Swiss-Prot record:
Residues 604-623 are annotated as: Disordered. Interacts with UvrB in an incision complex. One of its GO terms (molecular function) is DNA binding. The keyword DNA repair applies. This is UvrABC system protein C. Belongs to the UvrC family. Residues 12-91 form the GIY-YIG domain. One of its GO terms (cellular component) is cytoplasm. Keywords: Cytoplasm, DNA damage, DNA excision, DNA repair, Excision nuclease, SOS response. The gene is uvrC. NCBIfam families: PRK00558.1-5, PRK14669.1, uvrC. It comes from Solibacter usitatus (strain Ellin6076). Its main location: cytoplasm.
Length: 623
């Protein structure tokens, strides 16, 4: 049966429809008050003229549907099916930022800890929390007052003695037989769940009953501890009431779009204060409709998230707004309103978020060329430097298992790389694989020379590496009497920037931050330059050592071959005619004879430090 014929047989009831391709894969999920009317609209001339709808109908070979009682049920089912199938024609939430939850595990002795990954493992997840450190503060409070741990000790068996957490009263000690009972531990976990769920009155009531029972049984120390905990819980409840009176929890959404490119900003207000901001981006919204876009996103965000704010502010209304409000109200068990503010402070806040969405779009999608001074000031602010750095010198070490050790220094100055100032170093004093010692040597040589020549220091010295390399560079500068030199390192993979003197507060920039991209690009250029020099040095050593073993081939001939062919492999692959054009027919015959009649001799270890002695800091010949 043709797809158009199937449409005529759809009911007029509310439900969810699923378009499928020729392989039976779900490519689009939608909902409707009337299935037949909604699906039939896809075949109108106006709709088929859209790129997205036209492509969808071209690829769709079949349609399934599920009937529900009302639009609210259709909305919830649509969201679940989108999560399950991830259809490529639906607008999918791609969040680059994850927020922490507090997890209560599903174990005999549940543990409590912070996680950013939600799993279907039977555990309870509370959150997400804004700002992120709130989750860690809550878990610390739970350890201190409820003594439910987050440790990774195997709790499926007993251990001979408890860990430090038990002795400092942060754990009930379920890992050691006799320290607690199953009932006492289960009661503590119930208290934790009530606390995290915000049911402070219920928690205080239960604690008070246990306090009175302990007092009657003359367990006075336990009763005193419960009394103190009741006081703490009631104080928290009172603070929350006062905060709620000052301002509600609100999420504010704004979008800036130049289809197919879209930037979304979400501001999170908690107790009337802005506590966090999220940025999301799309590059595939060719048929962008702001109402449909926001409707789809709000369902994906809030139907899958435990916390729902009292108000959600959006720039435009959308079709299923009331149904979504009802669902979220049921989920929150308190009234949830989705509004489009028209005046006053709420309208002004929405305008602020819209401005930020436009800036996010520009930063992500436009080719911006800020002034050199603006870049320097942004870098100064991000790394908390004393001055805006107009010149950055970046170092990297390269070797293979401690052999052919070299270093590079590249220079960024006034907004661009300055290749004429690049330097490369052959490591002289370090034996074996010791990157820290190599970094000390190179930094010492570079800045001792600047001191001798009375040259100014750069605005920032950047090291490719982690804390070890950073401290090695700092030790080298201190040893030659250079103090207060701005110094930082960027660790590979984690992309965390450490600033010397501020190591306890590493700089973690957004992965789309232009400052992070700048630091990464300088670091990557230093790495490229070091690896290129290392490879060249290794090839030179291999080529020289092997060709020197050929009878009748002198040093000048070797240098000609090296200059022309660059590597041993290319010399081996060259024909006699190709070799003869470089070194003459007689030498070419000797090279060919060597490779056709004699096995290559083992490579002797050759010293290459002499070239470095002549020129300690060698400018890049390609610059």
């Amino acid at each position: 049966m043709e797809l158009r014929d199937k449409v005529g047989q759809l009911p007029f009831s509310p439900g969810v429809y699923l378009y499928k391709d020729s392989g039976g894969k779900v490519i689009y999920v939608g909902k409707a008050k009337s299935l037949r009317n909604r699906v039939r609209s896809y075949f109108s001339e106006d709709k088929l003229g859209d790129i997205k709808t036209g492509t969808l109908i071209t690829e769709a070979c079949d349609i399934d549907y599920i009937l529900v009682d009302n639009e609210k049920e259709a909305l919830a089912l649509e969201n679940n099916l989108i999560k399950q199938y991830k259809p490529r024609f639906n607008i999918l939430l791609r969040d680059d930022k994850t927020y922490p939850y507090v997890k209560v595990t599903n174990e005999k002795y549940p543990r409590v800890y912070v996680t950013r990954r939600l799993r279907k493992d039977g555990a309870q997840y509370f959150g997400p929390f804004f700002p992120a450190n709130l989750a860690h503060r809550l878990v610390h409070f739970i350890h201190r007052h409820f003594q439910v741990p987050s440790c990774k000790v195997d709790l499926t068996r007993f251990h001979p003695k408890p860990c430090l957490q038990f002795h400092i009263h942060r754990c009930l000690g379920p890992c050691v037989q006799g320290l607690t009972t199953d009932e006492a531990y289960a009661a503590a976990v119930r208290d934790v769940r009530l606390f995290l769920d915000g049911r402070h009155s219920d928690l205080a009531r239960g604690l008070r009953a246990r306090m009175e029972a302990a007092s009657l049984e003359m367990r006075f120390e336990e009763a005193a501890g419960l009394r103190d905990l009741i006081t703490t819980v009631e104080e928290i409840e009172e603070r929350q009431k006062m905060a709620a009176a000052k301002g509600d929890d609100v999420d504010i959404f704004a979008v800036y779009a130049e289809p197919p490119l879209v930037a979304l900003n979400i501001f999170h207000l908690r107790n009337g204060q802005i506590v966090d901001r999220r940025e999301l981006f799309w590059e595939d919204q060719f048929e962008y409709d702001e109402s449909l876009f926001l409707s789809s996103l709000l369902k994906q965000i809030y139907l899958d998230q435990q916390f729902v704010p009292a108000e959600i502010h959006v720039p435009v209304e959308f079709e299923d707004l009331e149904a979504l409000e009802e669902l979220l109200t049921e989920k929150r068990q308190r009234r949830v309103e989705i509004r489009t503010p028209q005046r006053g402070q709420k309208k002004a806040l929405l305008g602020l978020v819209e401005t930020n969405a436009k800036h996010s779009f520009d930063a992500r999608f436009r080719v911006l060329k800020p002034s050199s001074r603006a870049i320097q000031e942004a870098l100064q602010d991000a790394l908390n430097l004393p001055d805006a750095p107009s010149r950055i010198e970046c170092f990297d070490i390269s070797h293979i298992q401690g052999t052919d050790k070299v270093a590079s220094m590249v220079v960024w100055e006034d907004g661009k790389m300055k290749k004429s100032d690049y330097r490369k170093f052959i490591i002289r004093t370090v034996v074996g694989n010791d990157d820290f010692a190599s970094m000390r040597e190179v930094v010492t040589r570079r800045y001792s020379r600047l001191q001798e020549e009375k040259q100014p220091m750069p605005g920032l010295v950047l090291i490719d590496g982690g804390l070890g390399q950073l401290h090695a560079a700092a030790e080298a500068l201190e040893a030659i009497g250079i103090a207060d030199q701005p110094l930082a390192s960027i660790a590979k993979r984690e992309e965390i920037i450490y600033v010397f003197g501020q190591e306890d507060e590493p700089v973690v920039l957004d992965r789309f931050s232009p400052i992070l991209h700048l630091v990464q690009s300088i670091r990557d250029e230093a790495h490229r330059f070091a690896v290129t020099f290392h490879r060249s040095l290794r090839n030179t050593r291999q080529l020289t050592s092997e060709l020197d073993a050929i009878r009748g081939v002198g040093a000048k001939t070797v240098q000609k071959l090296l200059k022309e062919f660059g590597s041993l492999e290319r010399v081996r692959a060259a024909t006699e005619t190709q070799l003869a054009t470089v070194v003459g027919r007689a030498a070419a015959k000797r090279v060919i004879a060597h490779y056709t009649t004699v096995e290559a001799a083992p490579e002797p270890v050759a010293s290459v430090a002499q070239s470095e002695d002549a020129a300690p800091d060698v400018p890049d010949p390609q610059a």
